[in-house]
């Protein structure tokens, strides 16, 4: 099985897991919505997968600052990361689904 044609997509805790597990691997991409970095998480190498991080600006479950922390860490090691912030809270609105579809189409 080739994983280069696979994308991991996760929401909230699932996004945290997709990011942690997916970025070191040669995947086609990683998408995280309303995710956060696990405590003491850091990247040692440039992520192999292009990454899309999406987050609601009004998320009170996982504050949008978590997206900034993830973006900073991925950027620090030279990773390719796109950010999409939408109005709303801890959810996946249609506009985020559409943004994810655009990301996937470009892979």
PLM-predicted stretches and their roles:
Residues 1-5:
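Conserved small/polar residues in nucleotide/adenosyl-binding loops
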Residues 9-14, 18:
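Gly/Ala-rich beta-loop-alpha elbow adjacent to hydrolase catalytic centers
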Residues 21-22:
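Aromatic pocket-lining residues of Rossmann-like dinucleotide-binding sites
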Residues 26-37:
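A conserved short beta-strand
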Residues 37-48:
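Conserved serine/cysteine hydrolase catalytic core
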Residues 46-51, 77-80:
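Short, proline-enriched alpha-helix->beta-strand connector loops that line the catalytic pocket
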Residues 68-107:
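C-terminal catalytic histidine-bearing segment of alpha/beta-hydrolase fold enzymes
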